[in-house]
Amino acid sequence: MTINESQTLALRTAPTLSDATQKLLNGLMGLNGEAGEAIDILKKSLFQGHPMDNEHMAKELGDVAWYLANSADAIGYKLEDIFRMNIDKLKNRYPDGFDSEKSQHRAAGDI
């Protein structure tokens, strides 16, 4: 399955909302909530004696991906395009791989 096919399938189960702002708000709030659930799994493993549950983590990461797909759609983007833009940005920022010096001293306007 391609990234865009996954996005299309995710959108089949998205709520019908009144406008793009509501879609984006729902997507970003959901993304934040699901990311919180993922970090909670790790927190419990590291600090509360729970075993690390990779299957549960994978399911929460799937929920993160679902909300990411919805958020991207709300602003009119396909996930493949967003992923490509991000990789292009990182290649430009770190042409020879990650460099902590370049990370600490990024060029003006480098978002």
Regions from the PLM with identified roles:
Residues 1-111:
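Flexible "arm" and connector segments at domain edges
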